[in-house]
C-alpha cells in the first residue's frame, strides 16, 4: 500500500485548479438565490447509520469540486486503507499497534487474531461479562458492602476514559430508561471529586476505575481520594469498586476490586466509547439493551463507510470536505453545533477525538509535512451558542465551517405551545435559519449590519436522538477523523503531544527541574 503526503497527490493539484476555476460559481449567497436551490438542498443528502442523514447543500462545492474530491479519495486509496485497518494491519505506526475500535461493535472483514486470540471474540466475551454483572447489580444479587442495592455509579477516568463515556451518558439519560444514576470524576483537581462525592449516597454507589495502563497519574490519585472518603465512612472499597483496564496492568485480577473488565492496547482512549470503557457505565446506567442498540448504530455507520462513492459515504465525504476547507479555503477551525441539549458534551468529545488524532506536523513516517493538518474544534449546543460566539462566526474576519446536528423530536416529549409554535419547533426554526443566515448573509448599507455570508455549513439530521442514532453519529465522526488522517498521511492513533507535559509535571513533583520551570512552579506550589 502506498502512503503519500497530500501535496504529492496529482488529484490535490487538480482540486486546487478546480477551485480556482470554479470560484465564481461557489458563492453560497448566489447558489441559494437560484431556482435550483430547493433541488440542491434535497439532493445533497447522504444516508448515515440509524435514520440519520448528512446534508452538505450549504458547502461551497459543485460537481467539478466533488469530482476532484472523488479523485483524491481514489488516489489516496482511502477505502483500501480502511480495509487494511479492519483486517488488523498495524496502522498505528508510532506505537506499532493495530487499530481495532470498529471491531468492538461488529466484524466487517477478516478475523483478527493476535497471539492466538480472536479479538472479536475477546470483545464479545467482555460484553457478555458486563451484561451478566450489570444484571446482577440491577437485580440486587450484587449488593454494596452494607448489603444495600446500588443506586449510583461513578466512573473515575480522564481523557478518553471520561470524555466519550460522559458525552454518551448525557446524550441518553433523558431518552433511555435509567436503572442507575451515573456520575464522572476526571480532573485531579480535588474539587471535582469532592463535588461528586458530596452529591451522592456513598453507601449505595459503585465506582468504576478506568485506566488501560493502570498507571494514569490523575486517575490513581482520584482513586486514592475516593477510597479515603469511603474508608472514613466505614465502607469496604473492595465491594464497591471495579476496574476497567488491560490484562497486563497492575489493576488486572486485583483482589482490591469487585471485578475487572478488560480492554487492550489496540483501542485508543478517544476511540474507546464502544469498548468496555463506555459499555460498562452505560450498561449499569441504562441496561445492556441500550448498549446493544448503541453498538448496532455504530456498526451500521462503519459498514456504510466502506463505500468508495463519496456521494454515498457520509463520513468519507465529510472528511474530504473538511480537507477542502482546511487546505484549499484556509479555514483553521470547525464549529460543532448540536441543536440538542442532550449533546452538550459531544463537542468536547469531538474536540479530543479530532485534535488529539490529527493535531500533528509530521507524517506517519516521522517526516515533517508542509501543509496544514487538523483544525481547532469547538462548539456548544444551540440556541445557547447563538447568544455567545455566533457573532464571530457571522461577522468575524475568519471563516469557520459549521457542523449542525438536529432532530425532529425531543427526547422526553414534554413541550408546550406558545405564540403559535412549540419549543421544539422554535429550536429547529433557529437551526434552519442559522444555516441560511451563514450561507446567504444580508446586504445592508450600514456596514455594521452587513453579513457577507458564504460561511460553509453541513447538517446531520434525524428523527430523534436514540441509542442507535447516537452510535451512528459517533461512528461517523470517528471514521471522518480516520479518513482525514489517511488523506494527510498522519498517524491518527497516537498522541505524543500528551506525553511531554506529563514528564515535566513529574519533574516538578520530584523537585528535579530546570530553573525556569521551578520559577513557574513556585507561583503555585
From Swiss-Prot:
Main subcellular location of this protein, as a coarse class: cytoplasm
Annotated GO biological process: gluconeogenesis; glucose 6-phosphate metabolic process; glycolytic process
Catalytic machinery residues: 356, 387, 502
Keywords, sorted A to Z: Cytoplasm, Gluconeogenesis, Glycolysis, Isomerase
Location in the cell: Cytoplasm
Catalytic activity: alpha-D-glucose 6-phosphate = beta-D-fructose 6-phosphate
GO molecular function, one term: monosaccharide binding
Pfam families given in the database record: PGI
Enzyme class, first EC level, given as a word: isomerase
The enzyme's E.C. designation: 5.3.1.9
Keyword Cytoplasm: yes
GO cellular component: cytosol
Pathway terms, separated by semicolons: Carbohydrate biosynthesis; gluconeogenesis; Carbohydrate degradation; glycolysis; D-glyceraldehyde 3-phosphate and glycerone phosphate from D-glucose: step 2/4
Annotated family: Belongs to the GPI family.
Protein name: Glucose-6-phosphate isomerase
UniProt source species: Treponema denticola (strain ATCC 35405 / DSM 14222 / CIP 103919 / JCM 8153 / KCTC 15104)
Name of the encoding gene: pgi
